[in-house]
Each structure stands twice: as C-alpha cells, then as structure tokens.
Amino acid sequence: MDVSIEKIKNLRASTGAGMLDCKNALEEADGDIDKAVEILRKKGAIKAAKKAGRVTNEGIVYSYIHHNEKIGVLLLLGCETDFVARTEDFHDLAKKISLQIASMNPKWISREDVPQEIIDKEKEIYLEELKNSNKPENIKEQIVENKLGKFYSENCLLEQEYVFGEGESIKDIIDSMIAKVGENITVDKFARFAIGE
C-alpha cells in the first residue's frame, strides 16, 4: 500500500519515530494510524530489549518540586552518551518519570528490586485471605499470582501505568525513548520527599 507523506508526518509527530520506520509501519498497518502506532511500540520494545545490556555511564540528576512545595523528587536517569543526556526529549522523559514518582509514590524501580521477604509476606497475606475458600489449589495459586502482579503494578515504578498516559506503563515510555534515540536508558535511583509523610 502506498501511504501519503501527510500520514507519515502525522505518525512521526505523534511517536517521534524515524520517517522510514513510520512509512514501514503505516504500510504494514494498511494506512491505519492506530495500528501503525502499535506496530512502532512493539518494535520499540524489541529495540529496547536489544539495548538493555548496554552500560549507561552518562545521564542526569533531575529534580522536581511539586507546585505546592510539599512534594519533591530526585531522579538519577542514565543513558549512554552526554549528547542524549543534554537533549530536550531526555529532560522531558525525566520530568514525566518524576511526576509519576511524585504522584504515585512507587517503592521500588522494578519487581527485581522488591526484597524476597516482602514478596513472601504478600503471598502469605493473599493465601490467608483464600484459606476458607473452596477453590482448588491451582486456582488459589493463580489468584495469588494475579494479586502479586497488581502489587507490582502499584509499587514498582517501571510497571506503573503512566498517570498522564493512555494505558502505557513507565517502561513503555522509556522503551519508546530508547527506540527513538538508539541508546539504553535506565532509571538508576530515585528518592521522593513529602511534608508530613
């Protein structure tokens, strides 16, 4: 299918992907913008996975203070080169992540960071809730796994749904940026401060 330059430009403006990637995604999606965005997102996740092992020795320490001056965030966002660290897009990403941390108060960066004793305690609580249920053991185990998944999505930054997004997780947003800049990007550390907490 031959796609118009206008559609390619619109897709590029909304995703930040390269012109050729936009053209190919639109052709694959038969001109459907929404399908093309989904294709680009999947390819972005693939690109991000390929770059995940690369070292991020550059980056920025980003600070955010909420307008009421009662919540603040310090974020260490890593990348591979100082060129990317200086871009407006990288700073915008740091701001988005900091807003997420300020509003959703995650406890850990990823599920791998959650201490095993906390996971065990959560499982114990969930199993106790199901103790008197007549459900088979395999169903109980599935319920516990689902509840753990919800626990991770509430408490792990990368798994949280972006507060200003449409079903995207923080990991999805980072993966899109990785695909755009061609470098690995990592959330290395964060700290959230709040008056009265």
Swiss-Prot record:
Give one Pfam family, short name only: EF_TS
- Tell me which GO cellular component terms the UniProt record holds: cytoplasm
List the transmembrane segments.
Answer: none
Gene expressing this chain? tsf
Species source reads: Petrotoga mobilis (strain DSM 10674 / SJ95)
Entry annotated with the keyword Cytoplasm: yes
Sequence segments annotated as region (Involved in Mg(2+) ion dislocation from EF-Tu): 81-84
Which Gene3D superfamilies is this protein grouped with? 1.10.286.20, DNA helicase RuvA subunit, C-terminal domain, Elongation factor Ts, dimerisation domain
| Places the protein is found | Cytoplasm
Name the family: Belongs to the EF-Ts family.
Name this protein carries in UniProt: Elongation factor Ts
Q: Which UniProt keywords apply?
A: Cytoplasm, Elongation factor, Protein biosynthesis
The role this protein plays is:
Associates with the EF-Tu.GDP complex and induces the exchange of GDP to GTP. It remains bound to the aminoacyl-tRNA.EF-Tu.GTP complex up to the GTP hydrolysis stage on the ribosome.
Q: Has UniProt tagged this entry with the keyword Cytoplasm? A: yes
Picking any one GO molecular function of the record gives: translation elongation factor activity
SUPFAM superfamilies per UniProt = Elongation factor Ts (EF-Ts), dimerisation domain, UBA-like
